[in-house]
A protein has these predicted regions:
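Conserved acid/base catalytic micro-environments in cytosolic active-site loops
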Residues: 1-135
């Protein structure tokens, strides 16, 4: 609800040819199939794709983490894995931001649109944090 509306507003405001790639890491229910890609596709002319393992990130595309997966980026490609901790103990945003900072360095920025809890805040304490806006 709040997160979905924030994503829709964000993508409606962007030009589809910005040259940037967007990777979304919302907290999705692992027991249900997600239709987030279909919903967001109505808000942008960019392709909105459910992330696949080993897919190279391309400009002007939106990638969405699939339910019940962890995601990292290594050498510009998304890496998916099955979580090894219970759902309430996962921090998928922190994990992705850490890998993004290591892989892309100064070429990356994180935008936290909405949410509750602390997932996504650990990056602020890292040695090499990403610029974050939208808190």
């Amino acid at each position: 609800a709040g997160g979905l509306e924030a994503f829709e507003q964000f993508f409606r405001s962007l030009a589809p040819d910005s040259g940037m790639a967007f990777v979304l890491v919302p907290h999705l229910d692992p027991s249900h199939a997600s239709i987030l890609t279909e919903i967001l596709q109505r808000s942008t002319a960019m392709p909105v794709i459910e992330a696949q393992d080993q897919v190279a990130v391309a400009p002007n595309c939106v990638y969405v983490i699939p339910p019940n997966r962890n995601m990292a980026i290594f050498h510009g490609a998304l890496q998916l894995s099955v979580p090894d901790v219970p759902r309430g103990q996962r921090m998928p945003i922190d994990a992705f931001l850490r890998s993004l900072a290591e892989d892309q360095g100064d070429n990356a920025i994180a935008i936290i649109l909405s949410g509750t809890g602390t997932d996504g805040t650990k990056n602020e304490k890292e040695k090499k944090p990403l610029p974050i806006c939208g808190r």
